[in-house]
């Protein structure tokens, strides 16, 4: 027996023992597992906490391994050929399992090449935690990109979070560490324990490519169920490209999933949200919902705009399958789903991407490029292939795996300009000495080109607040390739105008009309978003001046203007019924206000104007074509009146829109129109059903033969105070 013990002891190098025991050894596969010797093989295992270990050979023979000089070390001789399993005696019982170190490299060289080039569009099928079967053994393959780490181990509830138990293999050419762990399946919680390039231990990291995450404040990743979701939206997907074409109506209900409706202070899960939200959105006439970011994020107060889990729907509202069911049910009711997506920056939480492998891996090393002082976040290094590939794969994950119909890309301006929110000397110029971020421009172009290629019919929308040229121009023509861009200029100008006392509006008339100067420079969405009802800005209703009747009338007129102005529509939740207070993510919307006829009237107006917008092609078919709009009255600053014609394709009836932004009734206000006969008043924001005074034109107005505003006929109109009316010609 003493000879055997001596032989076993000689199998362990003292330096190796120390490195294993201190969780510092960077090449576990060189030590652990079965290795050939002159007489057969030697099997080494390191299982801290184990009391005994045996190797069970394929023929049933059991070989007891001898304990080594450090607790948890076991070794023994095996025949030169044949497989084996480990039988491990723990204090609480016995475990029979395959040896993780008996398996060869897992990821193919092609996968590793695609990862290194930033071209792996199904990145979460390679990296992250994937339940697989290897050589007849079921388990989970873990893989993480950490090229500068000196050691990486996977830790989890399957190994008591012990970093000594499952050190990983480095695939040197790619910087990817991998390990197949037998018997680990869906639901297992895990993280990665890394040491930096100089051997220092880093905080345990969540998996950047995890498809499921632990509910906050927990920060672990979870092995996702590999069972594919069974979709039932073939009809929607087959017609999506047509539904989301440039000439189709798009009216978006922007919402925060956690605060749309709270029942007894509890968030709805995805199924509960689908039960309540989808019928509401359909009844209100919106064509799409836009969800504020649903990727996993540690701080709820960020509303999702500081995410760390870019491949995992947040656990706050249920499982990934729950999110898929929500999207599926939206599609079955004809509602598209857009999600906000954040490829600009990420938070500094220790368990996240910050200094992931002990170096600035996902972020820029220079804080003049890599730190965003406005948000105290780190900025992605879009010039690094693996990082841009990681982000593009995240976009593809939601567009392809979850059938999402579009992404609204957050904070595009902050990415495009190197001097964004920085003073002189606080930013690094590009190679030509300029402020444009060439790496981000290349990233966005590639992202949008790939989305068009691989997810036809999906739309990409930019939240871009500057005059950067060509945001929605084709990549082939030098543009960024987005489908649509938020029209922040329209939003700022018109909200400022609407917030003025009507007596002063005559001096700011240009704020109402200037948007048409550049309306066709891009393809626009008109956004009244969450950003306009937070941070002390007040609510949309609260911005309106005057007493109660004026505020509600102003709001109704403004919404009438918005829904008839060229551009797709976006309205944040609560604005559709005139929420009087700022949005608070910790509280549900004040739905009880619908007991008040004034708020119910605003809601009814939004429902009707949505249907009007969809019903009349003139209001949407030529949003991007100057032929679809013509001023009739654009210069009546004294009366704060505007009138314009919206035109559709050949055969579509034009629509006349007239808005009076003063509280003065205008009697006999004459508007030139292109044809005579009886024009029908199809919308009046002062209608009693909306909470107005029912001042209007009785539904019908006869055009008189009179040359006016370049037309041969004129309509004598009564313009309600702070009111918008819409008329259609005979026929």
From Swiss-Prot:
User: What UniProt keywords are attached to this protein's entry?
Assistant: Carbohydrate metabolism, Glycogen biosynthesis, Glycogen metabolism, Glycosyltransferase, Transferase
Q: In which pathway does it act?
A: Glycan biosynthesis; glycogen biosynthesis
Q: What is its EC number?
A: 2.4.1.18
One Pfam family, short name: Alpha-amylase
What InterPro entries does this protein's entry cite? A-amylase/branching_C, Branching_enzy, GlgB, GlgB_N, GlgB_N_E_set_prok, Glyco_hydro_13_cat_dom, Glyco_hydro_13_N, Glyco_hydro_b
Catalytic activity reads:
Transfers a segment of a (1->4)-alpha-D-glucan chain to a primary hydroxy group in a similar glucan chain
Q: Which GO terms describe its biological process?
A: glycogen biosynthetic process
Q: Mind telling me which GO cellular component terms the entry cites?
A: cytosol
Q: What Gene Ontology terms describe what this protein does at the molecular function level?
A: 1,4-alpha-glucan branching enzyme activity; cation binding; hydrolase activity, hydrolyzing O-glycosyl compounds
The organism's superkingdom is given as Bacteria
Give the enzyme class. Answer: transferase
Which residues constitute the catalytic centre?
410, 463
Q: How does it assemble?
A: Monomer.
| Record family assignment | Belongs to the glycosyl hydrolase 13 family. GlgB subfamily.
Q: What does this protein do?
A: Catalyzes the formation of the alpha-1,6-glucosidic linkages in glycogen by scission of a 1,4-alpha-linked oligosaccharide from growing alpha-1,4-glucan chains and the subsequent attachment of the oligosaccharide to the alpha-1,6 position.
Q: What is this protein called?
A: 1,4-alpha-glucan branching enzyme GlgB 2
| Organism of provenance | Xanthomonas oryzae pv. oryzae (strain MAFF 311018)
């Amino acid at each position: 027996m003493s000879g055997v013990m001596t032989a076993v002891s000689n199998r362990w190098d003292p330096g190796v023992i120390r490195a294993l025991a201190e969780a510092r050894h960077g090449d576990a596969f060189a030590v652990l597992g079965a290795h050939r010797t002159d007489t057969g093989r030697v099997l080494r295992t390191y299982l801290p906490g184990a009391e005994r270990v045996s190797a069970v050979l394929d023929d049933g023979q059991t070989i007891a391994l001898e304990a080594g000089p450090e607790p948890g070390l076991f070794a023994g001789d095996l025949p030169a050929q044949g497989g084996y399993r480990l039988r491990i005696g723990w204090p609480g019982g016995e475990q029979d399992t395959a040896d993780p170190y008996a398996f060869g490299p897992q990821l193919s060289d092609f996968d590793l090449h695609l990862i290194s080039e930033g071209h792996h569009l199904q990145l979460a099928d390679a990296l992250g935690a994937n339940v697989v079967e290897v050589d007849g053994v079921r388990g989970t393959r873990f893989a993480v990109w950490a090229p500068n780490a000196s050691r990486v181990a996977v830790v989890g509830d399957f190994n008591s979070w012990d970093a000594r138990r499952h050190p990983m293999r480095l695939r040197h050419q790619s910087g990817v560490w991998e390990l197949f762990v037998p018997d680990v399946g869906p639901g297992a919680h895990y993280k990665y324990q890394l040491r930096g390039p100089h051997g220092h231990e880093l905080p345990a990291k969540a998996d950047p490519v995890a498809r499921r995450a632990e509910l906050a404040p927990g920060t672990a990743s979870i092995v996702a169920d590999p069972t594919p979701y069974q979709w039932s939206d073939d009809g929607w997907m087959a017609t999506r490209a047509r539904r989301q074409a440039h000439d189709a109506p798009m009216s978006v209900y922007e919402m925060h999933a956690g605060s749309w409706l709270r029942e007894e202070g509890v968030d709805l899960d995805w199924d509960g949200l689908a039960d309540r939200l989808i019928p509401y959105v359909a009844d209100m006439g919106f064509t799409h919902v836009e969800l504020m970011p649903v990727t996993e994020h540690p701080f709820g107060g960020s509303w999702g705009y500081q995410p760390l889990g870019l491949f995992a729907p947040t656990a706050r509202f249920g499982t990934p399958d729950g999110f898929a069911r929500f999207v599926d049910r939206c599609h079955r009711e004809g509602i598209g789903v857009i999600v906000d997506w954040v490829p600009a920056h990420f938070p500094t939480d220790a368990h996240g991407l910050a200094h992931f492998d002990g170096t600035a891996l996902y972020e820029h090393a220079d804080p003049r490029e890599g730190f965003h002082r406005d948000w105290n976040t780190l900025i992605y290094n879009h010039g690094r292939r693996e990082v841009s590939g990681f982000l593009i794969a995240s976009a593809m994950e939601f567009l392809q795996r979850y059938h999402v119909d579009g992404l609204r890309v957050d904070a595009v301006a902050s990415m495009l300009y190197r001097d964004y929110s920085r003073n002189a000397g606080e930013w690094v110029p590009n190679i030509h000495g300029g402020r444009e971020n060439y790496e981000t421009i290349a990233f966005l172009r590639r992202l949008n080109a790939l989305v068009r290629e691989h997810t036809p019919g999906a739309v990409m929308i930019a939240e871009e607040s500057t005059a950067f040229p060509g945001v929605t121009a084709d990549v082939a023509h030098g543009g960024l390739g987005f489908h649509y861009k938020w029209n922040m200029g329209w939003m700022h100008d018109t909200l400022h105008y609407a917030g003025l006392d009507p007596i002063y509006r005559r001096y700011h008339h240009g704020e109402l009309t200037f948007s048409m100067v550049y309306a066709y420079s891009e393809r626009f969405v008109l956004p009244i978003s969450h950003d306009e009802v937070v941070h002390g800005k007040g609510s949309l209703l609260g911005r309106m001046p005057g007493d109660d009747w004026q505020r509600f009338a102003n709001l109704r007129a403004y919404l009438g203007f918005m829904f008839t102005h060229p551009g797709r529509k976006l309205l944040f939740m609560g604005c559709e019924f005139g929420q009087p207070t700022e949005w608070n993510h910790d509280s549900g919307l004040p739905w009880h206000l619908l007991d008040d006829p004034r708020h119910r009237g605003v809601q009814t107006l939004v429902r009707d104007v949505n249907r009007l917008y969809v019903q009349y092609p003139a209001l949407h078919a030529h949003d991007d074509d100057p032929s679809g709009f013509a001023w009739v009255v654009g210069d009546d600053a004294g009366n704060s009146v505007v009138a314009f014609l919206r035109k559709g394709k050949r055969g579509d009836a034009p629509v006349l829109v007239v808005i009076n932004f003063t509280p003065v009734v205008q009697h006999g206000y004459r508007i030139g129109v292109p044809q005579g006969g009886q024009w029908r008043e199809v919308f009046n924001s002062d209608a009693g059903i909306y909470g107005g005074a029912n001042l209007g034109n009785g539904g019908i107005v006869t055009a008189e033969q009179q040359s006016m505003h370049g037309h041969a006929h004129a309509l004598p109109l009564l313009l309600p105070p702070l009111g918008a009316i819409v008329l259609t010609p005979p026929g």
